[in-house]
Design a protein with these regions (language model features):
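N-terminal Rossmann-like NAD(P)+-binding subdomain of aldehyde/semialdehyde dehydrogenases
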Residues: 1-106
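ALDH superfamily catalytic-core signature
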Residues: 2-3, 165, 198-318
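Generic non-transmembrane alpha-helical segments
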Residues: 39, 43-50, 156, 160-164, ...
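Rossmann-like NAD(P) dinucleotide-binding subdomain of oxidoreductase/dehydrogenase enzymes
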Residues: 98-234, 272
Length: 318
C-alpha cells in the first residue's frame, strides 16, 4: 500500500488551530474530558475489526495477538481514566509552613496545551493511542504521527480519529522523515515519543529550543537471566512466548540469555520444544507468527546468523 502523506504546509495550520482551541477553554471541563474518553472508547470498539484487519495486512498479526497486545491494552487504559479522571483532577491539599500562616496550600493540576505524539511501527495501535488517552484526560489537544512502515494501520487510525474528534482537538499527520522534521520545527507544549535512541536525540534537541517537556520511551537490549535453580521447562516456555510475540519486535522481548553453564544444554532443548509447541515445525504456516516489518529489518536480523552458531532454526525467506 502506498504511504499517505500530509501536506507539510498544513502542519503549522493544524498546530495553530489546536492552540486556539485549547486557549478557548473547550477542553478544560472535567465532564467534557470524561465525555471525550467515553467517545474514544466507543470509537475503538466500533473500529476494532478494521484495526485488527490492518494489523494483519501490515504485520501478519493475528486477531488474537492484535486484541491482547494492542486493543485490550488501549481499552483498559481508557476505562481506567474514565473511572479516575474526576479524582485525579481534584485539588490536593498540602501542609502549609507556619511562616505562611494563615494561607492554605493546594496542588492544582493544569493541562500543558498541545501535545505531539510520535509512535513506532511495532505496536502501532497501542503505542500511538494509549498516550492519547492521557492527553484527553488531562485536557490537552494532540497531533498524532503514526509510523510510515504500517500504512494500513495508519490509514485506519486516521479515519477513526476523523470520525470521532474535530481536527482542532485531535488530528493525525502522516508521512516520512520530512514530515517528522516539519513537526519538530513547530513549538509544542509536550512531546511524547516512542522509538529509537537516535531519533529520540533529535526529538530532545528540537524540544530543548523551547524548553518543551518530553517523554521518551526508547529501545534497548533486554537480557534474560536463568539460574541453575530455575524451572527449566517453565522458563523456556516464557522465553519462547516473549520472543515469538510480535516476532520478537518488542522493546522488552528477551534479546539475549544469560544461563548457568550447568543448564545450558537442557534449556536449549526445552526452548526448541517450546518454540515448536507455539508455532509448529514450520512457523511460516502459523497464523500466529508475525512478519518482520520491512527489508532493512530482515537483512539486519539475517546478519546476526553469521555472528554465532545456529542451535536450531536459522532459515530465512524474504
Amino acid at each position: 500500500m502506498a504511504l499517505t502523506s500530509t501536506n507539510i504546509g498544513r502542519i503549522g495550520e493544524i498546530r495553530a488551530k489546536q492552540e486556539s482551541y485549547f486557549r478557548s477553554g473547550a477542553t478544560l471541563d472535567v465532564r467534557t474530558r470524561k465525555a471525550n474518553l467515553v467517545a474514544f472508547e466507543k470509537a475503538v470498539l466500533k473500529w476494532e475489526k478494521p484495526l485488527c484487519e490492518a494489523l494483519w495486512k501490515d504485520l501478519h498479526k493475528s486477531y488474537e495477538e492484535s486484541y491482547i497486545a494492542e486493543v485490550s491494552i488501549l481499552l483498559g487504559e481508557i476505562r481506567t481514566h474514565i473511572r479516575n479522571v474526576g479524582k485525579w483532577t481534584r485539588p490536593q491539599r498540602r501542609p502549609t509552613p507556619m511562616k505562611l500562616f494563615p494561607s492554605r496550600s493546594k496542588i492544582i493540576s493544569e493541562p500543558l496545551g498541545t501535545a505531539l505524539i510520535i509512535s513506532p511501527w511495532n505496536y502501532p495501535v497501542q503505542l500511538l493511542l494509549t498516550p492519547l488517552v492521557g492527553v484527553i484526560s488531562s485536557g490537552c489537544t494532540a497531533v498524532l504521527k503514526p509510523s510510515p512502515y504500517v500504512p494500513e494501520v495508519s490509514d485506519v487510525i486516521e479515519k477513526m480519529i476523523r470520525d470521532t474528534f474535530p481536527e482542532e482537538y485531535v488530528a493525525v499527520v502522516q508521512g516520512d522523515r520530512d514530515v517528522n522534521t516539519a513537526l519538530l520545527e513547530q513549538r509544542w507544549d509536550m512531546i511524547f515519543f516512542t522509538g529509537s535512541p537516535s531519533f529520540g536525540r533529535a526529538v530532545m534537541a528540537a524540544a530543548a529550543k523551547n524548553l518543551t517537556p518530553v517523554v521518551l520511551e526508547l529501545g534497548g537490549k533486554s537480557p534474560c537471566i536463568i539460574d541453575k535453580d530455575a524451572d527449566i521447562e517453565v522458563a523456556a516456555k516464557r522465553v519462547a512466548w516473549g520472543k515469538s510475540l510480535n516476532a520478537g519486535q518488542t522493546c522488552i522481548a528477551p534479546d539475549y540469555l544469560m544461563l548457568h553453564k550447568n543448564i545450558k544444554d537442557k534449556f536449549l532443548s526445552e526452548l526448541e520444544k517450546a518454540f515448536r509447541e507455539l508455532l509448529g515445525d514450520d512457523p511460516q504456516k502459523s497464523e500466529h507468527f508475525v512478519r518482520i516489518v520491512n527489508d532493512a529489518a530482515f537483512e539486519r536480523l539475517k546478519g546476526y546468523l553469521a555472528d554465532g552458531e545456529v542451535v536450531f532454526g536459522g532459515k530465512t525467506d524474504k
